[in-house]
């Protein structure tokens, strides 16, 4: 893979690209990284690259030097990425995607930014490394290079480690331990010595979920309700049992129609609304009516096909902001839950 970095401070990259894993990868030929100075394409005797904006404070990089710098290294299959706080947030998924590009051109921002005409003409994508502002885009470019390099064959000594790291499956990693077995009275969990690889994997997954929920609730929500068709690749939408042979509709009065639609879309994994109607099953529909004066709470009965579906229903309901109420008496899995408008859903599952 080839990467060209365009900035006003090409020497900024010298040490990081000579040391550590990146330096070794470059020496071995797995990576080729060049740093170019945009000032080489500056205008006039003094190689001017910046000027005052027509409206606003500070200075801007001028369009002509930036465009010329990009075009000097651009090829047919090049992808130009501008490091900007306005861009898409960098993720493990995006890093993996970029690692497949044969040639990347990374454009570093400076001053107050870059003339919009240069961006519109040459940039394919804008990427941000976080919701904060740096003195320039060089540090962001290094972060991006380091993140994507891990997915290039030959960069890491053990490529499997890249597949198992935090965020690769959308979750944080669990804890790691090495010798000694006991340190200052704290022991390594016994399960790691059991020899049962499946039990250990299940334990790691459980701890990973718990850690993500505690430390990064945003990632936890995205794992279950994010961009993997909402449910994740391994899960299907919740299946409700429809006992009535007739078409059945539930009508709920809500204060905030938009908020309620979002809640139920995520809850049932269904994005397509027919106006204010959402089809929950083959014969069951949910209608929402916005009103400022609700006449009272509606009680809805839902029976799920499996106990696993019952548990997932409650977990998702709570994570999306709904409230869990009383647990039913007896052996039947039964629970009352309340939606964002106080309507009561009585949830149970089929007994087999």
From Swiss-Prot:
What's the top EC group for this one? transferase
Positions of disulphide bridges: none
Q: What is its EC number?
A: 2.1.1.228
What is its biological role?
Answer: Specifically methylates guanosine-37 in various tRNAs.
Do the record's keywords include Methyltransferase?
yes
What does the entry give for GO biological process?
tRNA N1-guanine methylation
Q: Which UniProt keywords apply?
A: Cytoplasm, Methyltransferase, S-adenosyl-L-methionine, Transferase, tRNA processing
Q: Which reaction does it catalyse?
A: guanosine(37) in tRNA + S-adenosyl-L-methionine = N(1)-methylguanosine(37) in tRNA + S-adenosyl-L-homocysteine + H(+)
Assigned protein family: Belongs to the RNA methyltransferase TrmD family.
How it assembles, according to the record, is: Homodimer.
Please tell me where S-adenosyl-L-methionine binds in this chain: 109, 129-134
Source species of the chain: Chlamydia muridarum (strain MoPn / Nigg)
**InterPro entries this protein is in?**
Alpha/beta_knot_MTases, Glyas_Bleomycin-R_OHBP_Dase, tRNA_m1G_MeTrfase_C_sf, tRNA_m1G_MeTrfase_TrmD, tRNA_m1G_MTases_N, tRNA_MeTrfase_TRMD/TRM10
Q: Where does this polypeptide localize? A: Cytoplasm
Give the GO molecular function terms: tRNA (guanine(37)-N1)-methyltransferase activity
Q: What is this protein called?
A: tRNA (guanine-N(1)-)-methyltransferase
Q: Which HAMAP family match?
A: TrmD
> Would you tell me the Gene Ontology cellular component terms?
cytosol
């Amino acid at each position: 893979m080839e990467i060209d970095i365009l900035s006003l401070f090409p020497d900024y990259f010298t040490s990081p690209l000579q040391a550590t894993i990146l330096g070794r990868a470059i020496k071995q030929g797995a990576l080729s990284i060049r740093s170019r100075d945009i000032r080489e394409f500056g205008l006039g005797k003094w190689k001017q690259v910046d000027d005052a904006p027509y409206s606003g404070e500070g200075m801007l990089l001028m369009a002509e030097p930036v465009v010329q710098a990009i075009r000097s290294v651009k090829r047919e299959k090049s992808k130009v990425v501008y490091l900007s706080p306005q861009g898409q947030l960098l993720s493990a998924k995006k890093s993996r995607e970029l690692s497949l590009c044969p040639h990347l051109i990374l454009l570093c921002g400076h001053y107050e930014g870059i003339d919009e005409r240069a961006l519109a003409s040459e940039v394919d994508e804008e990427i941000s490394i976080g919701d904060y502002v740096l003195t320039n885009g060089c540090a962001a470019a290094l972060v991006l290079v380091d993140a994507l390099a891990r997915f290039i064959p030959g960069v890491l000594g053990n490529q499997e480690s890249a597949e198992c790291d935090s965020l690769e499956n959308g979750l944080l990693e669990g804890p790691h331990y090495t010798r000694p077995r006991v340190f200052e009275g704290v022991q390594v969990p016994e399960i790691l010595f059991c020899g049962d690889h499946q039990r250990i994997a299940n334990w790691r997954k459980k701890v990973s979920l718990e850690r993500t929920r505690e430390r990064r609730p945003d990632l936890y929500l995205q794992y279950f309700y994010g961009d993997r068709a909402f449910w994740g690749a391994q899960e299907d939408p919740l299946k409700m049992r429809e006992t009535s042979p007739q078409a059945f509709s539930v009508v709920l009065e809500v204060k905030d129609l938009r908020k309620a639609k979002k809640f139920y879309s995520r809850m049932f994994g269904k994005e397509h609304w027919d106006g204010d109607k959402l089809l929950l099953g083959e014969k069951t529909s949910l209608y929402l009516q916005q009103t400022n004066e609700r006449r009272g709470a509606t009680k809805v009965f839902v029976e799920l096909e499996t106990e696993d579906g019952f548990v997932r229903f409650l977990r998702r309901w709570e994570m999306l902001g709904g409230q869990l109420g009383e647990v039913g008496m007896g052996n039947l899995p039964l629970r009352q839950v309340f939606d964002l408008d106080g309507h009561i859903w009585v949830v149970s599952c089929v007994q087999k």
